[in-house]
Amino acid sequence: MWFAGPARRIPAAGRPATLRLGFSLSPGMRVGLYGGSFNPAHEGHAHVAETARSRLGLDKVIWLVSPQNPLKSGHETATQAERIAGARAVAHGPAMIVSGAEARIGTQYTIDTLRVLKARFRGVKFVWIMGADSLASFHRWRGWTQIMAEVPVAVVSRPWISLKSRSSPAARRFARNRVASAQARGLPDTVPPAWVFLRGPLNFQSSTALRERMRQAKA
């Protein structure tokens, strides 16, 4: 869903309109798109999603569970069905929708997914959501500057990485497009490129640490 190389061209109309994605959105809705491997999903992910939902005034947050992260080894990744089930276990509340839509769409990279969803749900105010750890490596994503031009982006603070992420290549490149956190609620209505960094209480869970504990338990 994410990284490296030039973005493919996705038709602005046609096939996207026929897709059955398992959720319905109406024009004018404010919708966060939260993509990731979620391998495994944990309360830190839920914290990022809920922080963005409440601070931005979002109607829905769609967790896009990727078929496979191109930067991660396949043997380290659980099946998409397992990761979707894990995400649903921690995604609390009716505003949270966990989806494997990318497998149905046939996209692997965020920029392509965004273009399909924008064509499918015209008039919906999408915001891309990521943790600060993702912002630190955002410049490695395929078509990352195009992502910034497609939708506003909300970055939520994460332990140990927030300072590094705010001095990352992406943060520097789009420094003048950063929205003050006090104006975060207006981000979905802002013409991109626009992004906000949301600070707040931190959740220290991480997928890496959870996988390591699982490996040790099996040893």
What are these regions (language model features)?
Residues 2-219:
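Nucleotidyltransferase catalytic core that binds NTPs
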